[in-house]
């Protein structure tokens, strides 16, 4: 790949105005898009060809230059460069803003980065940016200090003048009043007139006094404000600010809008701020310290990177290329356009209006209003709806801004970068193909011809059936006869990939060799249905074609269905015979007493077959047959003198002989009935002991025999096969009496309602079980339904019980059990009431399934995200740690029995230490692979526990090592370097998610509800554990060893723990209805659970440490899956738990570069501490942090991965501010940028190998002139020269940098 060597990491940062102008090819000055008459882009508009490039290849706007020979010329008439039209996908423009605006991500994001940097509350910041308040940007302290005495004197003087003026005005009015009164006195006026004159004078004086006092107050206010004025002060009172500016404008500067912010940022001293914050953190407490920590993170981000904080204020806005925001003409002559064009037009219109207003010298208030509108227009372009009401288009639909283009399922990351459409693919309905081999699929001819079209056309030309590609294409389109012969030749040994959605685990995509079939449906091998979870009721599957030789080789070696027999979640076979095949093999291997030919002896199997064909020997009769090359089974008793390799006369049936013929020749003789369990054991054993080729062949034999004998068995179902047990009425009558007795006790008031319900439920459960037993006894061995269920082919006894026995108890819509059972069976038919109460459960089941699917899919997505960078990076990390796991436990009689969870805990691991028996004899060396055989040997030798390597204790810096992971469950061998074990773990846990129940069970209806003990189970419990949430009804654990006392008051109970070490008592308040696990005065150990309920994993981590927390999480997750009968290997859960515990919160930073309170990757924390210690300084201290999977995914070192997961804008904002560099170590990052993923064959150690094909191999590829003769590519299969045989990579020394 060309991009392979181009770059090793990807950095994101803040773009400054000069960056934006450098990227740009010209300024967009007009809001016009395209001319409605000519349909050509307008000059200087949003689609301008001069800026963004020509809209037709090699043609300028005015048409002066056409054709490729003018390449690179810039037309002197229209100024358009003659080049390809696709430059319109990459050339950017820009808009020069008449006033700066702030970037909404940095001001409105949570937390507000701008607010933290400038130490302003977000609402104050908003006031400044949107022109509601002035902000002081600089104060000349020295000049103010020097001039203060003079200014004070001036102020006092002015104040005195105001007072004097007031007093003199009042005195004047008093004089006038006196004269007036004297005049009135002389005229002998009435008292009323005098009063009127006095009142009028009083009013005038009051007005003067009020006005003067207001002026004096304002003067004082302005003066006090000026004296205490400092930078970043806000002033929302416009009048006060104007007066302040008019009087003392020399000493300070202030402004509003983004200009104020910009001025502040220009003068901001990062280093000094950082110092003062560190000082606050050292000496401060509480809120101040917390805020200082948060601010320091932001300040540090700018200090330690090349980022300038001025990038948060924009002087120019970039305009993205026009092809990424297209405008297309619809049929009716109207245009459909991208929302971005509307948002850009609003910005340009407002910008142009602002320029005009500034040129006209409009009043400040009008200009400010226009600036505010420009700010809002840019905000809605970047992130519409983040502040205020979103800008809407027709039909009140919010317009999609640049941020909306990135985030969510339909955003750029998830829609186009992580999920791409691919060519060379098709889809069709699937049907069963019982004649296929395990590695084959049937591909419809027409589909195959379309998929392989280019290959067929080239081959037609090579074989001279067509003169050129054009005529070859015509031949293919007209389905000429030669085409089909060529297609047959082309598809030989060219694998195709089949995929069924939903692809829940890696077995959802597998490779097959195509066989051409008639019709239009894809034929699928019946044994791979289990892996795809497919059935033939109308399912569809997609076909993909691997093109390159590398892709074909990978498909054939790694993905071929015959190589994917084991399930990655538990290492057990997934391609098991099912349904018809089981019933056929069951029919073949059962023995029937008293049938034709019983007791005869045959000299060979063929003689017995002849007798069967002649009708004198029944398939299931017990006979003796002489067998050559007989390999005895475990329980075969050899006659005296018999030696291995000799023929033997075996007592068996012809069916058993035919069944054993399907197994490998050296496989021990199986003399058991082949039901589902027995077949599973056989296939499991084959997968452990035989090469994959043999296993695949055997599976095909079993499938063929199964179908053949299923047809011959004549298994049918009729209504007469359903036999209702005769004892049913008697059983029910007996229990009716018991139920009536309980009811009467309740009516007499002897028992409470809860007890009555519980007892009735117990009674009817017992009745149901008795009827079920009677029904099973009444079914004969030859009954078809009995055979179907007993063999494991289909159905279970519970379903049969409901059809032929009794429907039993059902739940009401609340999920509580109704204490009256449905007594009818489906065979007898339900009454109306019974039918009605049965419908609740059925509907709930359907609604549940739909919810479960969505929740389970989201869980898988989070699991994949948190674990996607766990890749096996090295062979051995060299750790001495491991987990000690049990193999055997003593039962009630003191005898050793195999531990029930061995299959999913010890199996497929690597031993950490050697294992010896009681006498000291070494049974297995350290580093040995623990398989079924070794487990059996250790158990036989009486070993009870072993220490094994685990991902939890692995010390690899990145990813994990092969020894700690152990055996890859999908292949049965030690895991390869490069295996993406994190994704496998996520799939293994997520895939069975849909089988888990959704509900919070009420274990016995209302009874448990009264105790308030809802046990969260199923999927919600799994989510609670992986998200590390505190569970509902959390149970406390003892924080120290000591004695516990129970104290009760009327309101509540509390447990008081007195620690042994004499530290102060610890009190745990608990609910009165909680069930205690300790009694008053008991001794408890540290970490012991005190009450029934779920434990908070964070508490376990705090009290018992990380190892115990890991163990607790693994056990709890496994408990939920086991309760549903789902087997998942512990190592998958361990991989996820390792990711949850890989961060450390820094408590004290010491002399390191880490910040207190920072969440640091454990590897980075340890590396930094090693560096500090080696320089003789003080290392940082930290505590382990348990993070939920969502939080852990967002906290990853890779910003690309985090942004494509959730909260895209928040992640990108933070990453750009910190100037983060993505080392591209995980899988998602590389998928996003289109590089090969660094896992599997994408690792350098596998990609940098060249193997030259031999001439003989080239010649062998096609006998006729080769279709691929110009490829340096070796054919797969055929008789290849020995030097071209596959070579194990371990034989190559690939150099140390690949390790």
Curated annotation (Swiss-Prot):
Listed GO CC annotations: DNA-directed RNA polymerase complex
Binding site for Zn(2+) 1: 60, 62, 75, 78
This protein's record includes keyword Transferase: yes
InterPro entries for this protein: DNA-dir_RpoC_beta_prime, DNA-dir_RpoC_beta_prime_bact, RNA_pol_asu, RNA_pol_N, RNA_pol_Rpb1_1, RNA_pol_Rpb1_3, RNA_pol_Rpb1_3_sf, RNA_pol_Rpb1_4
CDD domains: RNAP_beta'_C, RNAP_beta'_N
EC main group: transferase
Chain sites annotated for binding Mg(2+): 535, 537, 539
Pfam families named in the record: RNA_pol_Rpb1_1, RNA_pol_Rpb1_2, RNA_pol_Rpb1_3, RNA_pol_Rpb1_4, RNA_pol_Rpb1_5
Residues at which Zn(2+) 2 binds: 877, 954, 961, 964
Catalysed reactions, as listed in the record: RNA(n) + a ribonucleoside 5'-triphosphate = RNA(n+1) + diphosphate
Keyword set includes Nucleus: no
Cofactor annotation: Mg(2+); Zn(2+)
Source taxon at top rank: Bacteria
Co-factor binding details: Binds 1 Mg(2+) ion per subunit. Binds 2 Zn(2+) ions per subunit.
Keyword annotations: DNA-directed RNA polymerase, Magnesium, Metal-binding, Nucleotidyltransferase, Transcription, Transferase, Zinc
GO molecular function: DNA binding; DNA-directed RNA polymerase activity; magnesium ion binding; zinc ion binding
GO biological process, one term: DNA-templated transcription
Subunit details: The RNAP catalytic core consists of 2 alpha, 1 beta, 1 beta' and 1 omega subunit. When a sigma factor is associated with the core the holoenzyme is formed, which can initiate transcription.
Alphabetized NCBIfam families for the sequence: PRK14906.1, rpoC_TIGR
Protein task: DNA-dependent RNA polymerase catalyzes the transcription of DNA into RNA using the four ribonucleoside triphosphates as substrates.
The name this protein goes by in its record: DNA-directed RNA polymerase subunit beta'
Originating gene: rpoC
